[in-house]
Amino acid sequence: MPSGAQGNTQSAAYKRIVNVSRNFQFKAALNKDTREWTFQHRSSGTALYSAIASLGDPSSPWDAVYVASPGPVQISEGNDHTVETKIDEAAVVHRSSSIVISPEDQEIFLKKATEYYRKKNIEADIVPVWGKVQRVPQAKSSSATITPSVSNKLSTAYQSIKSEALKDGPMYADSVLWDVLHYRIPTLDGYQQHNLWKNFTRWSQYFADNIVSNYRPGDLILIHDYSLFLLPRLIRKQLSDAPIVFFLHAPFCTSEVFRCLSKRAEILKGVLASNVIAMQTDSYTRHFLSTCSNVLGLETTSTHIDTSDGFRVVVFSSHVSIDVPRVYSRCNSKPVSLKIQQLKSLYPSDKKLIVGRDQLTKACGVTHKLRAFRELLIHFPKWRGHVVLIQITSLPVGNNYSNEELKKTENLVAQINSEFGSLDYTPVIHFHQLLDPDEYYALLSVANIACVSSVRDSMNTMALEYVACQQKNKGSLILSEFSGTAELLLSAYLVNPYDYSRFAETINYCLNMTEKERERRFSSLWKQATSQSSQQWIYKLINRAAYEVKALESHMTTPLLTYNILIKPYRNAKRRLFLLDYDGTLIESARNSIDAVPTDRLLRTLKRLASDSRNIVWILSGRSQKFMEEWMGDISELGLSSEHGSAIRPPLAGSWSSCAENLDLSWKDTVRDFFQYYVERTPGSYIEEKKHSISWCYQNANTTYSKFQSLECQTNLEDMLKHYDVEISPAKSFLEVHPNYLNKGSIVRRILKRSGSVDFVFCAGDDKTDENMFEVFLPTAFSNSHLIDEIDSTEYSGSHHTDDNSDANKVENVKVATFRVHIGLTDKPTLSDYHLPAPRDLGELLHNL
C-alpha cells in the first residue's frame, strides 16, 4: 500500500464522507393509525453497517452523512400487527397494505432516525431518499461544484409518496443484476426487464439528486454495492469534480455471463464514472477489468481502466471485515456464557455440532450442504447419533428469495431425519429464522465445525464471526471454493459443494482431526480473520481511495482546453490553420471501423468552420482515399489527407493528388502473409489493405488475447522489417505498417509550406501517430520563416482562398498562437499543450467557434 495509506494523512483534505447505501441500518415500520415510526436493527449486512457506523463515531476524523432509502417500509396497525411489504414477498402483498407517507411522516422519520443513531453514539447527518427532489431557484454560492448544465439548485422538499414506491425502484437490481453477478441467467423476459429498468433508473436519479443537494466541496462520496451501479454517472453529470468511490460487496461474474445483460453498457458506464472502484477479492477485480475490456473495448491494466470519456479509473481489492472486538466481547459476555452452558447440556461432548447460517437465495447452497451431510451419515455410519447439523436460514434482502430452494431444503431435512433420526436423535435441526444474537454467538462458540457451501458468494461474515468466537474451542471451518471468503481464509478447508462425496470426506476428516492439528489450523485462521476490524477496513478504504484520487490529479500533465482559453486568440487571428485527426479525435473509435462515420452535426460544423475565409481546415487520417471522398468529399472547402499523407485533396481543389509515387512496396507481400498467420490464430481479426499500407485489425476479437497477440506480432515484425524503410504503428485496436515517408509530421510541414504565414494553429489527435504532428510545432511560439526553411521543396497543387503569389502566402516572422490538443487521458506522455476528454468535447468546442 502506498505510503500514508495506512493512516489518515492522505484523506485529511476530505472533511466529510457522504456514505451512500441502499438501506439504513434499521428496518422501518409505520403505524397507519397512530402515524408512529418504529425501527428494528437489521440482522443482515452486519459488516457493512458496522463499518458505516464507525464513520459516525465521535473519534472519526471525518464528519459523516448517511444517504439511504427508508424502504421497504413495513406497515403496522393499531393492534401492532405488522404487514410485511418487503420486496421478496411482493407476490403476496395486497394493494391494501400500501399507504401514503405524508411530508409530516417523512419529517418525523428524519427526527426519529437521527435519535436512533445518537442513542448508539453515532453523529451523522441523515438523508432519507424518498423520491424526487424539488428544484428551487439557485442562489449565488461557491459552496458547490456543479456543472453549468445544472441551472437550478437542488433542495430536499418532502412530497407525499406511496409506500409501495419504495420497493419498486431496486427490483431490477434484485431480479436481474443479482442473478447475473451470481452466475445465473435472468429468467425475466425483455418486457419485464424493461419496466424494471425504468423504475431502477428513476430510483437511482432520486439518490443522485439527494446527494447533489447535500454535497459540499471537500466531501468524499462513498457508494456501496450493485443496487447503486448507475449512481456514479448520475452524480458526475451534476458534480463534475466530486471524488467518487464505489465499493462492490457482491461477487462480479465473468464477462461471458455479464454480457447476457441487455443494459450491460449502461451499467458499466454508470459505475465507471467513479474515480475509484474497489471489490472484495482480486478475482472479482480481474473479472471486472476483463468485462470492461471485452464489453466496452476499453484499455485496461491490472490496476486501472481508461474510459471512453478520457478519464482513468483506479480498481483494487479490499475485503470487508467484521467488528472483531465487538464480536469477541459479545462471545465472552455473561448472557452468551449462560447460553453456552445450556447448549453444552443439550449436546454433551460425545455429540459434535456442525453449524451453518445462510440466506435462502438461489446461490446459498444449503441443499448441497444437506446432501453432503447425508453422504457423511451413509458412508461414515459411526457418526450416526453423534453429529448434529444446526442449519439457520433467513430471508434475504431484495427479490432473491427462492421458494424452490426452501421446498428442497425442507424435503431434504425431512428425508435425513426420517432415515437416520430416532426418538433421542435428530440429525438436522433447521431454524427458519434468525436466532436471538446471544443464542447465535453461543452456537458459534460451541460448534465443532462451521460450514459454508454457497455456490456463489462474496465475503461470508458468518465464517469470520465463527473464527472470532472460537478462540477457546478452536473449531474447523469448511468453505465452498466458490465463496469470496476462500481467498481470505486460506487455512480453511475448501470444498466443491457439487462434489458431495468429497464434501462428506472433508467433514469426516475435520471431525476426526487431532487437537494439535486443529490448533495449528486455527492459529492461521485467527490471524487471517482478525487481521483488521470493520472500522480499520473502511478507514483503509477511504485513505487508499484518497491517495489514488490525489495520484490521478497529480498525473494530469496537460490542462483542459476550454472555450474561454481558445476564443480570444481565435478571434484575434487573421489566418488560422486547423489540423484534425479523424479516428478517435473527431469521432469515437468503434469496434468495427465501418461504424465510425461522421455525424451530420460534425459535418455541418466542419463545413461552417472551413467556409470562413480566414480558416484553413485539414482532416488528416489513416483512412483510405475512398472513405474520405465518400464521407467528406462534398465539403470542397476542406483539405483531406488519406493514408497518412499518401494522397491529398487541398481545399477547393477538384481532384486528389498522390504524394507517394515510386515508393518501394515490396514488403507488403511479406507483411500480408505474416498478418494472415495471426488472423488464423486470432478469431475475429482481419487484414485491411490500402494502397500504401496494410493493417491487422483485431477490434472484434477477444480483447485480452488479441492484445497479447499484437505485442508478439509487433516484436516479430520489427525484427523482420528492420532492413525496410517502414514504420510499424501500434494503435488502439490495430497494427499498421506503412512507409516511413508517410507520417503526419511530413504532411503537416507540406501543408504549412503551402498555407504560408498563419498566426493561429489548432491541431488535435489521440494516439502516437499524432505526436509527429505535435512535434512540428515545438516550441509553442515558433517563427514561420524558421519553420518554412525546414520544409521539403515539394509543393501541393490546388488553392484555398488565395493563390501562391498572394500577400497572404508570403512568409513573415509572425508570432503564432499554437494549440496542440490531445484527445483522451491526460497522463499519457505527449507533446500536446492541452487535452480534451473525448471526441464529443472537441466537436462541441469546434461547434461553438
Curated annotation (Swiss-Prot):
What InterPro entries does the record tag this protein with?
Answer: Glyco_trans_20, HAD-like_sf, HAD-SF_hydro_IIB, HAD_sf, Trehalose_PPase
Which controlled-vocabulary keywords does the entry list? Answer: Cytoplasm, Hydrolase, Magnesium, Metal-binding, Nucleus
Q: Where is this region: Glycosyltransferase?
A: 1-558
User: Where is it found, in Gene Ontology cellular component terms?
Assistant: alpha,alpha-trehalose-phosphate synthase complex (UDP-forming); cytosol; nucleus
Keyword Metal-binding recorded: yes
| Chemical reaction(s) catalysed | alpha,alpha-trehalose 6-phosphate + H2O = alpha,alpha-trehalose + phosphate
| EC number(s) per entry | 3.1.3.12
Gene Ontology terms describing biological process: trehalose biosynthetic process
Its UniProt pathway annotation is: Carbohydrate biosynthesis
What subcellular compartments does it reside in? Cytoplasm; Nucleus
Keyword Secreted annotated: no
One annotated GO molecular function is: metal ion binding
Instruction: State its cofactor.
Output: Mg(2+)
Role summary: Phosphatase catalytic subunit of the trehalose synthase complex that catalyzes the production of trehalose from glucose-6-phosphate and UDP-glucose in a two step process.
What family does the Swiss-Prot or TrEMBL record give for this protein?
In the N-terminal section; belongs to the glycosyltransferase 20 family. In the C-terminal section; belongs to the trehalose phosphatase family.
Protein name (database record): Trehalose-phosphatase
Q: Which organism is it from?
A: Schizosaccharomyces pombe (strain 972 / ATCC 24843) (Fission yeast)
